[in-house]
């Protein structure tokens, strides 16, 4: 069994999970998008990625140390350039990963932006497959691939990829990052299984990567979303702000995804 908690005012999770008869604490983040020239160009902002990456490194190190975590799980899209490793990646990513690995074990699950990420990943980082990994009863995955039926023994999916964002005109929360917590019918993902499956969708950790009306999420961005965003599949839903305020239930999903249920 596992216990999942959000980090107050941060798009990060702390998970207590029993592994090999020992309680382990895991810090989970997603979607750093280091060197995000695409995002900066579309928002007309000049960004200093050396400063931003140092800021992320400092924040994650402080969280890992203060919470005495045993490991950090990075849920993908560490870099932003989809097709290649660019100069900023060579300069920034190894330093970030090396710094975190000096504190605890680090697991990196590649996302759709992480092609050739192995070229800039230090040897002491646990580089996993794109399908993710299982710890205890949880599947950790980026969210751009569909889970294998072989993973059907899990009870929870923790994923990134979609950058969940709240959209409502004239709302103070319009364009703000949010958490999405779902309980769905398990057979929507694992047809041979009965019961329920919990799914947690992480916001992007990078505070400069955010949503606007031009980037509204489509359910087809993730094969997992495509299967579960239906009224007859969703059993329970909580939409939660970064500070932990509950904003609503499944009735607000239309404010997050570019379609109604």
Each predicted region: which residue ranges?
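Extended recognition/assembly regions associated with phosphoester-bond processing machinery
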Residues: 1-261
């Amino acid at each position: 069994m596992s216990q999942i908690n959000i980090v107050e005012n941060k798009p990060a999770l702390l998970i207590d999970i029993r592994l090999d008869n020992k309680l382990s604490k895991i810090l989970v983040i997603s979607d750093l998008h280091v060197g995000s020239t695409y995002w900066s160009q579309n928002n007309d902002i000049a960004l200093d990625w050396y400063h931003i990456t140092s800021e992320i490194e400092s924040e994650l190190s402080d969280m890992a140390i203060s919470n005495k975590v045993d490991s950090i799980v990075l849920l993908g899209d560490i870099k932003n350039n989809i097709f290649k490793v660019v100069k900023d990646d060579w300069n920034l990513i190894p330093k970030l990963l090396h710094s975190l690995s000096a504190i605890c074990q680090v697991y990196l699950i590649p996302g759709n932006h992480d092609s050739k990420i192995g070229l800039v990943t230090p040897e002491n980082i646990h580089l996993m497959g794109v399908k993710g990994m299982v710890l205890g009863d949880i599947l950790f995955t980026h969210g751009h691939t569909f889970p294998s039926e072989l993973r059907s023994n899990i009870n929870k999916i923790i994923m990134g990829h979609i950058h969940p964002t709240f959209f409502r005109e004239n709302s103070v929360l319009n364009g703000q990052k949010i958490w999405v917590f779902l309980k769905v019918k398990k057979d929507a993902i694992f047809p041979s299984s009965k019961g329920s499956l919990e799914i947690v969708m992480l916001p992007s950790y990078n505070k400069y990567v955010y949503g606007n009306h031009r980037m509204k999420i489509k359910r087809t961005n993730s094969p997992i979303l495509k299967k579960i965003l239906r009224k007859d599949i969703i059993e329970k839903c909580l939409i939660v702000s970064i500070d932990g305020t509950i904003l609503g239930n499944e009735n607000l999903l239309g404010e997050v995804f570019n379609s109604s249920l």
